[in-house]
Amino acid sequence: MERTLLLVKPDGVNRGLSGEILGRMEKLGLKLIGLRMLQMDAVLADKHYAPHRARPFFKDLVTYITSGPITAAVFEGENAVEKMRKAMGATDPAKSEKGTVRGDLGINIEQNTVHGSDSAENAKHEISLFFSESELVNYDRR
């Protein structure tokens, strides 16, 4: 089964949206196998967003993601990455369809409420930054 990482960013946590967002993913048939809340520090943010390091918005991104608590979750399921990306909507909430997380809940392109892995390969790396394998739970969903 494919796994993917979901982060509810500080704007989502601060507005009490973690539960709603996690529930939306479960309704897609994805199984929640790891969950934690944390305050991301600059070191972890730099590792997580390393592909964007050369981009002009990188510093602002790190400042934002470390500005408050986040919820980190791992979901598992068939085509988990694709399902979650579709449910999240476009990066810019103004361009996201209604019914998507960002279309319904995102504030702006900087405060777009969620992050999700963009490929199965990247998901493996991202998950390893936030969870050890022993923190991921295997169970039968009914």
From Swiss-Prot:
For this protein, the Enzyme Commission number is 2.7.4.6
The processes (GO biological process) annotated in the record are: CTP biosynthetic process; GTP biosynthetic process; UTP biosynthetic process
Enzyme class name: transferase
Q: Where in the cell is it found?
A: Cytoplasm
Active-site residues from the entry: H115 (pros-phosphohistidine intermediate)
User: Which Gene Ontology CC terms are recorded?
Assistant: cytoplasm
The signal peptide, as residue positions, is none
Q: What is this protein called?
A: Nucleoside diphosphate kinase
